[in-house]
Amino acid sequence: MSSAPCHTTVLREPAVDALLARAGPAPAGTWVDATFGRGGHTRLILCRLGPQGRLVAFDKDPEAIAEAMRITDARFSIRHQGFGQLGQLPAGSLAGVLMDLGVSSPQIDSPERGFSFRFDGPLDMRMDTTRGLSAADWLATADAGQIAQVLRDYGEERFAGLIAKAIVARRQARGPLARTAELADLVAGAVKTREPGQNPATRTFQALRIFINAELEELQQALAASLLVLQPGGRLVVLSFHSLEDRIVKQFIARHSRQPFDRRVPFAAPQAMQLLALARVRPDAAEVAANPRARSAIMRVAERTQAHGAERSDMRRAERPDARRAEHGEVLPP
């Protein structure tokens, strides 16, 4: 196994500043780092919290859990769970939630994890390597229609059909794909039109990673849960790194920061808005120059209001990852 690459946390100070903005000089209460990663945000939050503060972190990656276990601060605890399980925490118990979405540098730069077309390694792509199907497992059984749909839905790949047919043809002729280099070469051969400055396999790798890890569905679950677990005045801070993530976050905040209107009762709204949209922040030029991976980041900040609403029904409406994955042909355990 290769040594873990270095990870530079994007918008580290601005994100923690936004999270703790209303908390005073020695923040108490319970806070959540929903995506521990390598602990960049977690460590800064712990530096800022007062003695009565508590920080709970979530992560699916066993390597992230191992890193988190090195933190001996009694105010900190780690859960080996995806942040879609945020709703397991007590209602109204949290002073703030920080979500840093997507894949971390140690994950994408480790060939054995299979996230990148830049290195040859096993075609895995699972954030939690202890469970679930790898990308190779799924591609070994999915039909061309299922593969094409995933590439369209999660990669916005306009050559999805051609790539899917090439994957199935390769499987029938030579056996299933097992390595990242095999998939990258196959996509390069199938896609004749190049986007300037972008590897032709970029969208395919993104789509498979998002699908295998149910990333967008888990995000929807966590956002819905945030309405339930945040206390009034609690902050929601979300960092996204591509348009599919940011669209979900933007629409969620917009939907819950509008005053609902019931046509049947034109003189009164049935509930008040549940979120107050506060900010949209991009990394400055200095951060992008120091860390080019920050260039696509968008941070959105919202605050939970006093309003009560149908939080639990929102959580039920949030699309279940298993249901979405089943649509794309994955055989799920009972």
Curated annotation (Swiss-Prot):
Pfam family, one: Methyltransf_5
InterPro entries membership: RsmH, SAM-dep_MeTrfase_MraW_recog, SAM-dependent_MTases_sf
Reaction catalyzed: cytidine(1402) in 16S rRNA + S-adenosyl-L-methionine = N(4)-methylcytidine(1402) in 16S rRNA + S-adenosyl-L-homocysteine + H(+)
Chief subcellular location: cytoplasm
A biological process term (GO) from this entry: rRNA base methylation
Alphabetical UniProt keywords: Cytoplasm, Methyltransferase, rRNA processing, S-adenosyl-L-methionine, Transferase
Residues binding S-adenosyl-L-methionine, per UniProt: G39, G40, H41, D59, F83, D100, Q107
Transmembrane segments: none
Gene Ontology molecular function, alphabetical: rRNA (cytosine-N4-)-methyltransferase activity
Gene Ontology, cellular component aspect: cytoplasm
Taxonomy, superkingdom: Bacteria
EC number: 2.1.1.199
Keyword rRNA processing appears in the UniProt entry: yes
Region entry Disordered, spans: 303-334
Cellular localisation: Cytoplasm
Similarity section: Belongs to the methyltransferase superfamily. RsmH family.
Known function: Specifically methylates the N4 position of cytidine in position 1402 (C1402) of 16S rRNA.
Protein name in the entry: Ribosomal RNA small subunit methyltransferase H
Organism the protein comes from: Verminephrobacter eiseniae (strain EF01-2)
Annotated gene: rsmH
